[in-house]
Amino acid sequence: MFSAIAKRVFGTRNDRALKRLRKRIEAINAHEPELQKLSDEQLQAKTDAFKARLAQGETLDDLLEEAFAVVREASRRVLGLRHFDVQLLGAMVLHDGNISEMKTGEGKTLVATLAVYLNALTGRGVHVVTVNDYLARRDAEWMGRLYRFLGMEVGVVVPRQPREEKVAAYQADITYGTNNEFGFDYLRDNMAFRKEDKVQRDLYYALVDEVDSILIDEARTPLIISGPAEQAGELYEAMSRLVPRLQAQKPEERPEENPELGPGDYYVDEKARQVYLTEGGHDRAEELLREEGLIGENDSLYDARNINVVHHLNAALRAHTLYERDVHYLIRDNQVVIVDEFTGRAMPGRRWSEGLHQAVEAKEGLPIQAENQTLASITFQNYFRLYDKLAGMTGTADTEAFEFQHIYGLEVLSIPTHRPMVRDDAHDLVYRTADEKYEAIIADIRDCVQRDQPVLVGTTSIEASERLSKALKDAGVEHNVLNAKHNESEAQIIADAGRPGTVTIATNMAGRGTDIVLGGNLDQELAELGEDPDPAEVERRKAEWQDRHDRVVNAGGLHVIGTERHESRRIDNQLRGRSGRQGDPGSSRFYLSLEDSLLRIFASERMSGMLEKLGMQHGEAIESGMVSRVIENAQRKVEAHNFDMRKHLLEFDDVANDQRKVVYEQRNELLEADDVAETVDAIRQDVVEKVISEHIPPGSIDEQWDVPGLERTLKEEFGQELPIQRWLDDEDDLHEETLRERIQGEIEKAYRAKEAEAGASVVRHFEKAVMLQVLDKHWKEHLAAMDYLRQGVGLRGYAQRNPKQEFKKDAFAMFQEMLEGLKRDAVGVLLRVQVRAEEDVEAVEEQRRQEAERMQMRHAAPASAAAGAVAAGSGAAGAAAAEGDSAPTGGAQQQSAGGRGQETVAREGPKVGRNESCPCGSGKKYKHCCGKL
């Protein structure tokens, strides 16, 4: 109550922030009359004047008011669009490095020009980030006219672009591109073999369009550059044959207090997106695996040697039970194509990690593509935090304001609309069954069509959109479908969606970034007439459009129908936001049923009881604010759970990110250096010193020395045959310190002889090539080992250890081990390999170029069922498994924590029966403790 009173008296934090910014709008407007008097040349000269003032010590804040006024005047002349005062407000928020929440149709693309121009004056490059290549090209071309008028260079980066074009795009003042392309270019730059191969400059200012989609929805999906790893197609196929022979447990067979009761072999927890084997299911699975010859006669699933089998069984169970065709993926060109759960778009090239994608391919009887080993990866959370300054804009960010602040340090400010919002958002209608719900939706659509009112129907899956499409066909209602299967004609469908009586079915937010104009898109119609259209035809088209527009307005504007609530309120708000743009009339309503996923999982019992008490008949619906609040509370639960997942992932990924920064910094120093001889000499002396200490401990007596072992190591690892034992036999006064100096001196002499033979310049070139290649090799193996560690560390929670602290401790130890290993490896290569000419160095670089050609760029979709659903049942293990959702494992399952291939592990103690007490001392049975699958 007190907070409500305080808000009324003092205003909200948002109100106070906007009030402070509004004072500057008057100053911006005051520049307008004088700027209108300037010629084009005088207006264009302002850019150089601003740059000169910056060079003299003024700040961007000092220039803001006049610079914004210049952009507004230039936009009026070039684009015929003048920025509203609320758009100036939004741009100031963007310049301050925050998030501007502006409703659909408020001109976010135009708002961006103000902040982008101001920050581009520094000459350090501004990146404008969009959600797809179409929008990047469109905005670069559309707004590029304005920037070029003001003397700014504009570039656009897209996939498969020639290197020269990409370099030019990044050298431009303003660069448009997608989040994926910017991220992949960053990773590729940090794998470059020559500094000339790098394309990006330092990361200065990023302005992210649809910031909620990129920084929230895709936060758990890392960008991965990978190479082919070991193929295990036969094992995936065998598991796919085995899973249908296991019987699913029905919900009524497993009471809440004892979920392992019942005859089934496994049960599916839809809320947690997990699959668990029952006690009988373990025995049945072992029996089937023995039949297939996948485990030994006396083996169990618990044996360490079978961890790979468990991994594949887990993937197959998830593929068969949690992932449905035409809901979670499509089959296109004999390949599994993932469908984005947030936008409903197909995502070619993206693959689930942890073997899930291969398991789905096996389930569908498709060719199984090789698993990939991660060469480099980064999450969007960590990539965008590399920029000195980050800002974003969207129509729906307020519900995630805490996460933006907590993770990225970005404030969300809601900008008022230019015209008042008049859309009518009706209460949800809740039906008992999906059939009743669809009957009501079709009746509503028929009513709208009869009144010439356009309808946009939002569905949560391709399956739902096609079910509704079939029902409309049967009812004789013409309509357009916009989903991942029909995205080629997306722009045309969206352009026509505002015409009188048009019905458009779209999955979630397909078509986001394109406005639905009431009456249809007039600009597109006029553009189709060509460069020199007949004026009479233009007038006729305008008159037709005006007539259509008026009919739609009189019918009530665009009517939005939601067929199901999404897990996130923000996605629902985006769907509603398609209607009522810029003060247009409009309406929206969600139709729900107790069979919908969200209600079935989170709110069904309470809601079902409520409807039963009301004695509802077939076709009756309940409509009340109380029902809407129950649904909103369910959504809040899911949002909180998803936020915890993203936060959990970030805490783990921050460890890898700190290591990534160190490795990339060292790599860039190597790349930039013309001569790394000093570094190589220091590393060689350090490595040789440690090798000597392994066999001759410092301060030890002669009897403790392992001279034969030292001679063998120097010969096998470093190619140096030194008669150390003979030296000791021949020279009585050769003690430890002088022996160390002599070994170092002999190795130094051998290296200098090699240098003299090949030439100093050739050896310098070779040193750099070897250092880069060895660093990349060890970093790749370290990434695989880190993923392996991340998947298993949750199990330590059973031993009352904190998995996060354990991960940090082990990851640090592994990183130290990697650094020592790469130094030793590099010294070994440099001492062993004979380099006689520049061609030998070129051969190393050519090998590297061939490896680069085999690399694959992919945006790893999170495997919604957590990693190790079979291997980690609940508690800390389950939490870690959930964290491992999107871990880019690739070939990690073939790697041990040290990066070596899998080995058969001998059991150290006696075999523990499943019903015996757990050896950890917890007092629980083994199957309920450390042996829990």
UniProtKB/Swiss-Prot annotation:
May bind 1 zinc ion per subunit. One of its GO terms (cellular component) is plasma membrane. Monomer and homodimer. Part of the essential Sec protein translocation apparatus which comprises SecA, SecYEG and auxiliary proteins SecDF-YajC and YidC. Belongs to the SecA family. It comes from Halorhodospira halophila (strain DSM 244 / SL1) (Ectothiorhodospira halophila (strain DSM 244 / SL1)). Its cofactor is Zn(2+). GO terms for biological process: intracellular protein transmembrane transport; protein import; protein targeting; protein transport by the Sec complex. This is Protein translocase subunit SecA. It is an enzyme of class 7 (translocase).
